[in-house]
């Protein structure tokens, strides 16, 4: 028994399922999860000391790589002054100014402690501002585990084969409408059915919780137009895509302007953090200036703000996103080339520092129903083959992969050579 396996058995005695977030349990791929001891650059190291090239990156935040010296130095410097104050700090102001300078649609921003808090708060604000109850989300998209959002959700709930979760009253769920991602007609149908009831659309601009699904041309702008037509707010959930797809997020990359934006992951540099922001007239509706209540004991935590600021400043380096996109393209297209070489059907998607691959004969994947038709068993075999080769991918066929600036020529070469060997063995065994 490995030390990771022993720790997993020990953890299951005191932690439900042995993990603190379901996808980590490896239910989507089988076997026991790795317990991680440390990480540096493009590598993570398990409890047995084995190194892995990491394409999870703590589920997105580690865009510069693990244990980056500038972020580590910023955290250590902040710790010298104390861990938490429950009062305003200059760091919060600096972080707000930095976010606003990078995302033109954000005129004011409120810091919170997680992505779920950000989306939950943004939806409450949208409902309060419009005085409407219903929200519209998309099948296969995930926006955290708030009751109103865990309705036909993707991500962990989808991996577990549960389209929604017990514990959510029907009275909550009835206010959440679900449309088809990349299908404007399904959105318009719902708005025509409830023309004055829908407060907002919330969307992942690149769906990263049904693997990686970019928007088709015109889709995001079409949503913007429908919101304007019916008087609803548009919320772009950039918890995953914010500052990972481009310096101004997916909204900048695709040229669409939302009313509200949610952020997380990258803006914390690896620390727990979230944020929501947008139009000033909407943001002024939040307490203490407005009637919509939102609060948090650790919101704007100085350690998280310090780590996030260091990362955000580093992301302003010229040419960084072009280099990151080139790395991502190489990995995604390298996987596809290896699969083609060995006669294994595969489709790929990638944008910015995100990528996805699908074992399928479908030529392209643009919708949730297509994702569910992919070969999950082939993914599981490939996953464990890559793990044995020292490559750590997301342990679910429904999660995106992430590149970092720390992934260099050597790491990419080793990854693609490993993929070639694993796919060759899969073909030989078929």
From Swiss-Prot:
What the record says about family reads: Belongs to the class-III pyridoxal-phosphate-dependent aminotransferase family. HemL subfamily.
Query: What is this protein identified as?
Result: Glutamate-1-semialdehyde 2,1-aminomutase
Q: Which domain of life is it from?
A: Bacteria
| Enzymatic reactions | (S)-4-amino-5-oxopentanoate = 5-aminolevulinate
Q: In which pathway does it act?
A: Porphyrin-containing compound metabolism; protoporphyrin-IX biosynthesis; 5-aminolevulinate from L-glutamyl-tRNA(Glu): step 2/2
Q: Name one Pfam family in it.
A: Aminotran_3
Mind naming one GO cellular-component term on file for this protein? cytoplasm
* BP terms from Gene Ontology: protoporphyrinogen IX biosynthetic process
Swiss-Prot/TrEMBL keywords: Cytoplasm, Isomerase, Porphyrin biosynthesis, Pyridoxal phosphate
Q: Which InterPro entries match?
A: 4pyrrol_synth_GluAld_NH2Trfase, Aminotrans_3, Aminotrans_3_PPA_site, PyrdxlP-dep_Trfase, PyrdxlP-dep_Trfase_major, PyrdxlP-dep_Trfase_small
Is Cytoplasm a UniProt keyword of this protein?
yes
The record's annotation in PROSITE patterns points to: AA_TRANSFER_CLASS_3
State the needed cofactors, names only.
pyridoxal 5'-phosphate
Q: Which GO terms describe its molecular function?
A: glutamate-1-semialdehyde 2,1-aminomutase activity; pyridoxal phosphate binding; transaminase activity
N6-(pyridoxal phosphate)lysine modification sites?
A: 265
Subunit annotation: Homodimer.
Q: What is its main location?
A: cytoplasm
On whether Oxidoreductase is a keyword of this UniProt record, the answer is no
Which Enzyme Commission numbers does its entry carry? 5.4.3.8
């Amino acid at each position: 028994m490995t030390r990771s396996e022993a720790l997993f058995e020990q953890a299951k005695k005191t932690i439900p399922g042995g993990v603190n977030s379901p996808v980590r349990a490896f239910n989507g791929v089988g076997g026991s999860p790795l317990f991680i001891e440390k990480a540096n650059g493009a590598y993570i190291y398990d409890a047995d000391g084995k190194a892995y090239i990491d394409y999870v990156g703590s589920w997105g935040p580690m865009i510069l790589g693990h244990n980056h010296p500038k972020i580590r130095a910023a955290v250590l410097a902040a710790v010298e002054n104390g861990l938490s104050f429950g009062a305003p700090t200059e760091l919060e102001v600096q972080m707000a100014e930095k976010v606003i300078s990078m995302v033109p649609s954000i005129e004011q921003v409120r810091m919170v402690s997680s992505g779920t808090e950000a989306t939950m708060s943004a939806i409450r604000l949208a409902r309060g501002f419009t005085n409407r109850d219903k929200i519209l989300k998309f099948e296969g998209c995930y926006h955290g585990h708030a009751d109103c959002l865990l309705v036909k959700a993707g991500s962990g709930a989808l991996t577990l084969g549960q389209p929604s979760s017990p514990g959510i009253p029907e009275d909550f769920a009835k206010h959440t409408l679900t449309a088809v991602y990349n299908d404007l007609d399904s959105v318009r149908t719902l708005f025509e059915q409830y023309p004055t009831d829908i407060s907002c659309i919330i969307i992942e601009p690149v769906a990263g919780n049904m693997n990686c699904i970019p928007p088709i041309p015109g889709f995001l702008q079409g949503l913007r137009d429908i919101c304007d037509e019916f008087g609803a707010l548009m919320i772009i959930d950039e918890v995953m895509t914010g500052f990972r797809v481009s310096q101004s997020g997916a909204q900048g990359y695709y040229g669409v302007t939302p009313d509200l934006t949610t952020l997380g992951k990258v803006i914390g540099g690896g620390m727990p953090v979230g944020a929501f922001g947008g139009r000033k007239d909407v943001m002024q509706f939040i307490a203490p200036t407005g009637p919509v209540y939102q609060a948090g004991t650790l919101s704007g935590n100085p350690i998280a703000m310090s780590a996030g600021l260091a990362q955000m400043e580093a992301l302003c380096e010229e040419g960084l996103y072009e280099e990151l996109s080139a790395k991502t393209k190489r990995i995604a297209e390298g996987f596809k080339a290896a699969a083609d070489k060995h006669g294994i059907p595969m489709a790929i998607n990638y944008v910015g520092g995100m990528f996805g691959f699908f074992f399928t004969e479908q030529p392209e994947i643009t919708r949730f129903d297509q994702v569910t038709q992919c070969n999950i068993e082939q993914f599981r075999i490939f996953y464990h083959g890559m793990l044995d080769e020292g490559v750590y991918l997301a342990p679910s066929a429904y999660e995106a992969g992430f590149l970092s600036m720390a992934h260099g020529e050597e790491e990419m070469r080793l990854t693609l050579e490993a993929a070639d060997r694993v796919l060759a063995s899969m073909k030989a065994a078929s």
